[in-house]
């Protein structure tokens, strides 16, 4: 008995669909371990970034040193902020721009350069391509990070508390030095400003626009003069935004950056993160990473080989930063 050709075509179509579905279901991000290279002098960071992204949103341990070039050193046990720009594997410490730190009151503060900080444990920390999470032990705050090309999205889960979110444009580590900074309140959920700095790269200028998912109750600005070679060259600004939070309440901090202007940062925020929806942007960034990582498929029964390969591929794709056009 001859099989009709149309039946063979149907079988082939279903087989083809099944093959594509199986390949699409592979989660390549699960093979990426962003903590590889964060020990000794690997100088990598574990935070969140989109492929080729301008934003590298990652935790900072708050201390300078050769092992902490990227802002993060695995043997450390403190976190002193989450900033939006980092260098990976360079051997030269710079950037650390636009650093936020959530706390509950009263908060812990040490002498500079550490400043406001919290203890943390690697048992309460996780990361994969496009996502980072840690629990701040001293404040019982869970922090989650993701990013689009030009925006960083933070989700803080608070206990019932009087809480605050600090934005520190004064903080600098290693080669980095703050030349000038500015913060202005646009409305009860929106701020904008800039940070100018010098370091390994000279005359860096980062502009930002931030939108909170909840109105802040109060804002305080602490400004100090920046003196260099006995000359007043600018102002260092630290802002504190106060909130009352209920148990399990989440506040999103959405920040866009630009190398051109505050208006450009505002346009980037509206274009890439118009909604207060962490899970939506995380899913989009994860899908983006799977598209990039999935361009090379490794056939191996050795899980470690896959982790090593896809982590190396991931690290190669975070070096090609998307240039700002706004």
Outline where the language-model segments fall:
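C-terminal motif of bacterial Sec signal peptides marking the signal peptidase cleavage site
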Residues: 15-16
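Sec-dependent signal peptide recognition
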Residues: 2-9
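Accessory carbohydrate-recognition regions in carbohydrate-active enzymes
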Residues: 22-321, 325
